[in-house]
Amino acid sequence: NKNWIYYYDNNNWMESYSQDIPSARYFHAMANDWNSDMIVMFGGYGLNDTGFYAYRNDTWIYYADRDLWLEISDAGGPAPRYQHAMAFDNITGDVILYGGYGMNETGYYQRFNDTWAFNIQTQKWNKIDTPINPGKRSYHKMAGDHGGNIMMFGGYIDGVGYDESTWRYREGNWTMVESTTHPEPLRYHAMKHDREHDLIVVFGGYKLSAPYYSDDTWVLDGTTGSWALIETNTTPIARYY
């Protein structure tokens, strides 16, 4: 459970020496507040307080300017889970969480179709009831743009399997985005916002067809919902996770 910091200005990684850090885990999710140096982390699968492996529902904030982790013990929030996705909402200033796989209130394991918003100021989670949603889903990824469009792609849906639909969350509502061109069904891909061009970039992932590892680069416009496959002169080797 080490913490590393990447510094853009000198292209260098440095190990953090924060004393109180989250326990070792995987398949957690994180999102950074664009207006500050804070990063919000929730959930994952790893050691709990009694030393057993379990789905986690703890919320942590990392203050990059102070190299400090702080657990928000009274944040409330989603049920224990992993394989969920989180993204920053540039309009509300909240961090939005959707879906994942874990344990519900009755102790049964399931995929989730719930939407939550973490308020940076109050440091509380609030459940968002939406008219429709992208289904009980895990392994998906999300990223937001300057206009407050939080885009979701890929993952695994109960009753459907691995998915290739694109969804937009905006102002408390989910809508499916129709596009004739888009990536094939993916899981374990990376999805991040290009702040300079205000576009969302997807790279890699695990496909349903051979060769199973992807090295494709896709760009998504959050406003129009249009996808474009980018041909680059050089590319990282195909990968997932």
Identify the role of each PLM range.
Residues 1-241:
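Kelch-like beta-propeller repeat domains
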